[in-house]
Amino acid sequence: MVPVVALVGRPNVGKSTLFNRLTRTRDALVADFPGLTRDRKYGRAEIEGREFICIDTGGIDGTEDGVETRMAEQSLLAIEEADVVLFMVDARAGLMPADEAIAKHLRSREKPTFLVANKTDGLDPDQAVVDFYALGLGEIHPIAASHGRGVLSLLEHVLLPWMDDVAPQEEVDEDAEYWAKLAAEENGEEEPEDDFNPQDLPIKLAIVGRPNVGKSTLTNRILGEDRVVVYDMPGTTRDSIYIPMERDEREYVLIDTAGVRKRGKVTDAVEKFSVIKTLQAIEDANVVMLVIDAREGISDQDLSLLGFILNSGRSLVIVVNKWDGLTQEVKEQVKETLDFRLGFIDFARVHFISALHGSGVGNLFESVREAYDSSTRRVSTAMLTRIMAMAVEDHQPPLVRGRRVKLKYAHAGGYNPPIVVIHGNQVKDLPDSYKRYLMNYFRKSLDVMGTPIRIQFKEGENPYANKRNTLTPTQMRKRKRLIKHIKKSK
């Protein structure tokens, strides 16, 4: 069993900075701003070949109000999930009442807890941590997470010994029989070729949209638990939260993202980081659910976000949330507006749901699987070339400078999104209308749904281009006589 380590403490004591150090990523947003982390964030970490799961949490200070109450609940849930807790305090700020309250809660839970004093850079560590002995949690481990000082010592002298006590590493008996068996395996038959199948990989599903359209509510509804903070206030989610899950014997990684507003309205530095994280999550995903608020309709910002999704080549499912409570007349108006403004993406499934009450949510994953399967389906060169030939037979390419564009053959150039590469002569002169015709023909023939198709054209090289023939001596003499004859006739 992989041990779980939770990082807890007051806001802005450096939990996310240490999380990034331990996981060797920049997955957690970091800024000198209390309350930046709002949800539990999970990451894999390793020390001397031993893996453990690290949980970054929001801060607890005992004065929570509004959305901060939900943040504190997430932190308390992380403590329950963890096998061991790293309780972080701020050495510069000194001992605070909230530190004492957290220590009291940890003692009541009887969890293995190690006290970590952060921000000791530039201070005398021994003097900086004296006050924290009053918490009664034993030895204090001084670190400077932002510079990495003391982090390795924390791992080697605290976490590793604890892991050895809880789950000792199995030692291999290195006897003659073991080495003989290993040598026999190495000299035996070669391993069969790896038969890569994208269906065996988890589907990365990003849930995106404008602020407060119900993304986190939908995430919790799908998971069946309050996994992320939900609050009726735009900007509740600030980071992209990656959550592994399984549904109908298929593995997924659910990505709950921060809302994206118009660029002119994004003034807060933290929100700018959040938007970047959301756009990165879109590029990292296989399938994107774009959530639209039925009561506000589709906005220019929705279309802008949609354009980024399509340019990234991601598969798409459109989710119209807050459908409950609307009159039939309003529903018809919303559908007409969607048909008008989203007519250019007729390949994407549209679902009308209520994330709050759960209506329509169960049907989403059928479209997600359909989109992913379409985007990763392997198609042979023979089939693609045959489809291309049928398209040409139904509608010939246009004439360019008196010569008809010739398409020779087609093959797959990539997946997720599907890319079809067509080779031919003068293909760079094909008009956009014919390119769209080919794209739609391939989509219809391959029965592709939920994902964009990209067509790339490659020009056949002319071996005689930019080359001049070298005349033989006989040809040279003949040329001279011809030139002399022309001059005389003049």
Curated annotation (Swiss-Prot):
SUPFAM superfamilies referenced in this protein's UniProt entry, alphabetically: P-loop containing nucleoside triphosphate hydrolases (SSF52540)
GO terms classed as biological process: ribosome biogenesis
Source species, domain of life: Bacteria
Start and end residues of each EngA-type G domain: 3-166, 203-376
Record text on subunit structure and interactions: Associates with the 50S ribosomal subunit.
Family that this chain belongs to: Belongs to the TRAFAC class TrmE-Era-EngA-EngB-Septin-like GTPase superfamily. EngA (Der) GTPase family.
Protein name: GTPase Der
Organism: Citrobacter koseri (strain ATCC BAA-895 / CDC 4225-83 / SGSC4696)
